[in-house]
């Protein structure tokens, strides 16, 4: 009998491969994205010191979202993370899609962050 491939296990393997090459620095931090079934999260991480500089998620009260699992929520989170990053002085980042396919919510978050001023 055939077993169904575990999508999350494959995503984690992809993410490990990506993380070998994608390293954030103080000058150019890593924009990490995590997508759950109900929400989306983004962090700017300095891998040299292991510190999260800023974060944003669809759970943030300032966004006031009813549903955090759609493209509109991802767009709002992308705009918010870009605004917070610019307040901290980070304009250039390295995008870490977390092993997810660049499509849908991940793409919406990335494009919103670019439109709000982040360069990657």
Curated annotation (Swiss-Prot):
Keywords: Ribonucleoprotein, Ribosomal protein, RNA-binding, rRNA-binding
Entry's transmembrane regions: none
Presence of keyword Ribonucleoprotein: yes
InterPro entries the record matches: Ribosomal_uL18_bac-type, Ribosomal_uL18_bac/euk
Keyword rRNA-binding among record annotations: yes
Entry GO MF terms: 5S rRNA binding; structural constituent of ribosome
GO cellular component terms, semicolon-separated: cytosolic large ribosomal subunit
Biological processes annotated in GO: translation
One Pfam family from the record: Ribosomal_L18p
Function: This is one of the proteins that bind and probably mediate the attachment of the 5S RNA into the large ribosomal subunit, where it forms part of the central protuberance.
Oligomer and partners: Part of the 50S ribosomal subunit; part of the 5S rRNA/L5/L18/L25 subcomplex. Contacts the 5S and 23S rRNAs.
Family per record: Belongs to the universal ribosomal protein uL18 family.
HAMAP family: Ribosomal_uL18_B (MF_01337_B)
Protein name in UniProt: Large ribosomal subunit protein uL18
Source organism (scientific name): Brevibacillus brevis (strain 47 / JCM 6285 / NBRC 100599)
Organismal lineage: Bacteria, Bacillati, Bacillota, Bacilli, Bacillales
């Amino acid at each position: 009998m055939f077993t169904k491939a575990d999508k999350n296990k494959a995503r984690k393997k992809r993410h490990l491969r990506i993380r070998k090459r994608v390293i954030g620095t103080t000058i150019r931090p890593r924009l990490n994205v995590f997508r759950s079934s109900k929400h989306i999260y983004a962090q700017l991480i300095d891998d040299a010191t292991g510190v999260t500089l800023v974060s944003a998620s669809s759970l943030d009260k300032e966004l006031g979202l009813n549903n955090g699992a759609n493209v509109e929520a991802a767009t709002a989170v992308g705009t918010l993370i870009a605004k917070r990053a610019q307040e901290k002085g980070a304009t250039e980042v390295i995008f870490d899609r977390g092993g997810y396919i660049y499509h849908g919510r991940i793409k919406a978050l990335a494009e919103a962050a670019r439109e709000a001023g982040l360069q990657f």
